[in-house]
Amino acid sequence: MTRPVRTRFAPSPTGFIHLGNIRSALYPWAFARKMKGTFVLRIEDTDVERSSQEAVDAILEGMQWLGLDFDEGPIYQMQRMDRYREVLAQMLEKGLAYPCYMSAEELDALRERQREAGLKPRYDGTWRPEPGKVLPEPPAGVKPVLRFRNPLTGTVVWDDAVKGRVEISNEELDDLVIARPDGTPIYNFCVVVDDMDMGITHVIRGDDHVNNTPRQINILNALGGEPPVYAHLPTVLNEQGEKMSKRHGAMSVMAYRDAGFLPEAVVNYLARLGWSHGDAEIFSREQFVEWFDLEHLGKSPAQYDHSKLSWLNAHYIKEADNARLAELAKPFLDALGIDDAAIATGPALDAVVGLMKDRATTVKEIAEGAAMFYRVPAPDADALAQHVTDAVRPALADLAAALKAADWTKEAVSAALKATLATHKLKMPQLAMSVRLLVAGTTHTPSIDAVLVLFGRDVVVTRIEAALA
């Protein structure tokens, strides 16, 4: 009988979480949703010195923003210490683990001798009990580590969903330390107990964990557990071809929100960063879940491309509801000194966003473009001298008069502009640039007729006439 699918995301809360990290949450989340399974969030916080609540909060916030909801958790390893100690005691009792009194200095010296002899550095089993073997006398006052009694012969084999069949000889593995002298369990041991207790069927994680896998499988087999399906994802590289990391300039997940990216764009981009469905580039979350499978995970490192993410974000911004974008733009407007009170004095923000979004790649850019509608214009003096010339001023006066009488629609404003151009024998840039400067304070705006309609008749006419007075 096939076990119900149970996947997990098991981050260590030791600081920074970037797109490469969160991809290891996206894929198991998608697989669990596709298979109508369970997605578990486990916080691997046994590294007490480096773990922090701030880092946990960053993980939770990033997952929530991207819509990666979990069915169980967060489960904290530090809250499961009694369970780990229980399993350690059982392993000691069954001879699956043993105390080792070799000091760190002795182990270093052993490894140095092995290196000098051209051998692979490894623990030599000095304290491993064997039939007929006489063990050294335990040194007084020394607390031992606990080591797992790894098989001496045979091969660890698993069919990795990404890497294919992997075989590691047990002769390559030494007896892994599974508990420190103070009794606290080691990462590789905790992971096995957790995966076994939580019934994890599929482990989808970065390939930096490949070397841990044979050790974890051996411990799992010793405990009578059933190994999950493993899928080790190739590394995510930054734009310079280095492994993505904070040290190499990676942005945190929430920094993308703060830069004005939409979560659906980031999810779409992340989905393609190591998985594919034919040539499909743009797809919804629902399509991604429907299409996702382990067979189409990439086998080569994926390289981050910021311009591709920006292109996707621009697409999703164009598709997004104006009211939603308006709410998302407010914090960016506030950072520009434009609060709700200022917004209330200008045109409807939904309408402004609707005009600006076709030119934007981020919500931040929408806000920067929208700001002109809620500020008193302060055009550059040199720009005024360049565009509001004596040749243009009569046309501006006539345009103001025409706009006073025109219907306030885009079509009517466009007709007034064209009629003024014809009367004064000007080209559109000559008139449009000066109008943009006087009304909006900048020469960079969308279509002039659409911009003027949003500013409103009174504002447009008043600002043009004030400049001519």
Swiss-Prot record:
GO biological process, one term: glutamyl-tRNA aminoacylation
Listed transmembrane segments: none
CDD domains in alphabetical order: GluRS_core
Amino-acid positions noted as binding ATP in the UniProt annotation, renumbered to this chain: 246
InterPro entries, per database record: aa-tRNA-synth_I_cd-bd, aa-tRNA-synth_I_codon-bd_sub2, aa-tRNA-synth_I_CS, aa_tRNA-synth_I_cd-bd_sf, Glu-tRNA-ligase_bac/mito, Glu-tRNA-synth_I_codon-bd_sub1, Glu/Gln-tRNA-synth, Glu/Gln-tRNA-synth_Ib_cat-dom
Positions occupied by motif 'KMSKS' region: 243-247
Gene3D superfamilies for this protein: 1.10.10.350, Glutamate-tRNA synthetase, class I, anticodon-binding domain 1, HUPs
One GO CC term on file: cytosol
GO molecular function: ATP binding; glutamate-tRNA ligase activity; tRNA binding; zinc ion binding
Highest taxon in the source lineage: Bacteria
Keywords assigned: Aminoacyl-tRNA synthetase, ATP-binding, Cytoplasm, Ligase, Nucleotide-binding, Protein biosynthesis
Sequence motif 'HIGH' region, residues: 11-21
Catalytic activity: tRNA(Glu) + L-glutamate + ATP = L-glutamyl-tRNA(Glu) + AMP + diphosphate
Principal EC category: ligase
Cell compartment(s), UniProt: Cytoplasm
EC number assigned by the record: 6.1.1.17
Subunit text: Monomer.
Free-text function comment from the UniProt entry: Catalyzes the attachment of glutamate to tRNA(Glu) in a two-step reaction: glutamate is first activated by ATP to form Glu-AMP and then transferred to the acceptor end of tRNA(Glu).
Protein family: Belongs to the class-I aminoacyl-tRNA synthetase family. Glutamate--tRNA ligase type 1 subfamily.
Protein name: Glutamate--tRNA ligase
Organism: Burkholderia orbicola (strain AU 1054)
